[in-house]
């Protein structure tokens, strides 16, 4: 109550901050008249003047009013667009390193030019991050005209571009690209073998467009560079043939071989199913001996393949989670509906789906480098973002990224009507209502955008509309090449557009169609009269659509996140235009079935509803939103959990990458190598000649043999020590050190000091990279089973940190030993051989990177993970008796009437006891 009173008196934090920024807007506006009087040359010269001021010590904050005013005036002259006051506020929010929530159609792309221009003046490079390559190239080309006019260079990075072009793009003042490309290049730079091979020049300032999509939706997707492993894919094909012979259970307690946990996205074999699977695996010749258990230690890889195959068949649907195109399985992003070409699910899931679909199964991949988007974007010294929907995730932005969300007011009031949800008993009734609504809009000349959650539904609706002879367009992952054209025409009178979540984010749907697109299609020789005629026709269409009610949004299903629903609604009602939205739901929808169906079903039963009847009640909508909040909270917990674990990896990643940077920047690492060599020799001698030990405990033959086998050094220690008195471990260490130092000095003299320095750097980099790659694989294995420590009353995260530290320390010690051993073994006779070796290694890395892939690594869901179930099954396989509960009465729901006849709900009666 006190908080609400204070808010009424002083305004919310958002309102107070907006008032402060409005005072700076007044300063910017005061400069406009003077700047309008300047010639183009004088206005362009302001950029040089600003750069000099920065070199003289002036801060960007002090420059902000004048720099924003210059950018606005330049935009008016070059692009024909002048920033509104609210857009100036949005620009300031971005410069301050915050997230600006701006509604669809408020000109986010134009807003970004203000902080981009100001921060690019510092000369450190600004990265503008977009959700796809099309938007990166479009914005770089369109806004590049403004930046180039102001004397700043612009580059764009995209997959597969030539090395020289990418170097130039990162060398520009402003670089556009996708989150994937910036992340991939960051990892690739940290695999480079020389400074010249690196692209990026540090991560200083980034503006992330559609920040919620990148920092929230994709936060559970680590970016992974992987190369093919050695294992044959044949086992996936053989295991896949077994799955159709297993029976799915309706629920955990029904008969069958496996049951599906849709909330947790897991599939579990029953006891009967485990026996049946073992029998089938024996018949297929995959398991050997008759008494060979599926969960015996030697068969763990078979368990891995079986789990992957079960998930592929039970959880992943074609044209929903993936499509098959040109003989390949291509992932469909669950949040955007776009295809993710080149990306693969990890843990053998992708191979299992390939086997299921009968396409060539590619080899599993080994992780070479990885980073989550969470940790990638936290590397930037300053980060900001824009989106139309961030406020629902404000807590996550603040707690994970330290980013505050500010809601920017619209330039004109929003007049869109959001109608209550309509809820039906089944999908067929729902889709009948959707089709009727679409036909009604088309007849009245009102454009309609239909949002679907999958390609399958979009194509099903398309088929029904085709039969009804309703002209329409489909925008999904299969037609993404025509995205810009479809979106440009989606606002035409009576246009019907069916879209998956992708829905053309980044491109406004203009009522009456896109005027710019129509003008661009005119003949280059078109007269002003032709252009006027086109504009007049567009104005008529624009007014006709407004009179029909503007763009109407139909949602065919609620998404797990309210934010995705709001994004769909936000397509209508841009810049004060009319518009409307309505969601059609059924009890068979995923969200309703899993999270919200029980309460709504009871309401429907009480109302005596039958097929075709509909509920339209705000209380139902609120109940659904409550379910969405639960899912959002659960997904936040998963992302936070992922970050907690990845933070451990991140600290290690920072150490390794910092070490690589030092190696690449150093002219010579001779002192480091000498220090490492002495440390390694001391450890080696201690291993065979322990300190404070007696002669009988020494293993001089073992030490001598190790020096010979690992380092190629013949040192007759036993003969050297014969007849000497008072020989101890310290004396032996001195003799070995001296012999090794002389051996290294002789090698350096034979090949030359310069070649030796190059060899030392090359070996150190190569061994460090190999050690890090193997360490990543070890960490993956550790992480997969670490939660089982909970059974031993231990805290899994603390155990993970402890073991990760031990593994990392072991890896560093191994790298030291291997570096010294490699330097002793490698035979280089000339500078030319060294150059050839470096070139060969560089070609291998280039080839590896060309073959590398992005991978999705799915985070776990509700309930117990696969590994915990596997442990339980292992115990069963080893003869541990697990009692099976047999239910002799029907299961009673918590909110059902108690069977005792009291009339109370079960949870308030006998349910209290259980």
From Swiss-Prot:
Assembly: Monomer and homodimer. Part of the essential Sec protein translocation apparatus which comprises SecA, SecYEG and auxiliary proteins SecDF-YajC and YidC.
GO BP terms: intracellular protein transmembrane transport; protein import; protein targeting; protein transport by the Sec complex
Coiled coil found in the keyword field: no
Known cofactor(s): Zn(2+)
Cellular component aspect of the GO annotation: cell envelope Sec protein transport complex; cytosol; plasma membrane
Homology family: Belongs to the SecA family.
Binding-site list for Zn(2+): 898, 900, 909-910
Sequence positions that bind ATP: 87, 105-109, 508
Organism from which the protein derives: Xylella fastidiosa (strain 9a5c)
Function: Part of the Sec protein translocase complex. Interacts with the SecYEG preprotein conducting channel. Has a central role in coupling the hydrolysis of ATP to the transfer of proteins into and across the cell membrane, serving both as a receptor for the preprotein-SecB complex and as an ATP-driven molecular motor driving the stepwise translocation of polypeptide chains across the membrane.
Encoding gene, per UniProt annotation: secA
Alphabetical list of Pfam families matching this protein: P-loop_SecA, SEC-C, SecA_DEAD, SecA_PP_bind, SecA_SW
Compartments, record wording: Cell inner membrane; Cytoplasm
Gene Ontology terms for molecular function: ATP binding; metal ion binding; protein-exporting ATPase activity
SMART domains per UniProt: SecA_DEAD, SecA_PP_bind
Reaction(s) the record says it catalyses: ATP + H2O + cellular proteinSide 1 = ADP + phosphate + cellular proteinSide 2
UniProt keywords, alphabetically: ATP-binding, Cell inner membrane, Cell membrane, Cytoplasm, Membrane, Metal-binding, Nucleotide-binding, Protein transport, Translocase, Translocation, Transport, Zinc
Membrane topology: Peripheral membrane protein
Main location: membrane
E.C. designation(s): 7.4.2.8
This protein's name: Protein translocase subunit SecA
